[in-house]
Amino acid sequence: MANTVSAKKMTRKIAKRTAINRSRRSRMRTFIRKVEEAIASGDAATALTALRSAEPEIMRASQKGIVHKNTASRKVSRLTARVNALQA
């Protein structure tokens, strides 16, 4: 348990930041899931629109420190490859 005033304040800040990060990570995963569901259904047009909305969300998560930049790029790259394969 935090004893000093500054430690109590840091505990509050950490709790707030954790909630924000959890929300951002969940939002990113939701966008990824929408793309994957569209790919699974075989609908290329829906998959493409879902990918176009998911890409900025994934990159925003990387800029906010939710995921590493390379991880975000890898996710976008793999989703793009799957959508392109669906269109071909």
UniProtKB/Swiss-Prot annotation:
GO MF annotation, one: structural constituent of ribosome
Keyword Coiled coil: no
Ribonucleoprotein in keyword set: yes
Disulfide bond positions: none
One of the GO BP terms on file: translation
One Gene Ontology term, aspect cellular component: small ribosomal subunit
Keywords: Ribonucleoprotein, Ribosomal protein, RNA-binding, rRNA-binding
InterPro entries named among the record's database cross-references: Ribosomal_bS20, Ribosomal_bS20_sf
Family per similarity comment: Belongs to the bacterial ribosomal protein bS20 family.
Role, per record: Binds directly to 16S ribosomal RNA.
HAMAP family, sorted: Ribosomal_bS20
Protein name: Small ribosomal subunit protein bS20
Protein's organism: Methylobacterium sp. (strain 4-46)
Lineage: Bacteria, Pseudomonadati, Pseudomonadota, Alphaproteobacteria, Hyphomicrobiales
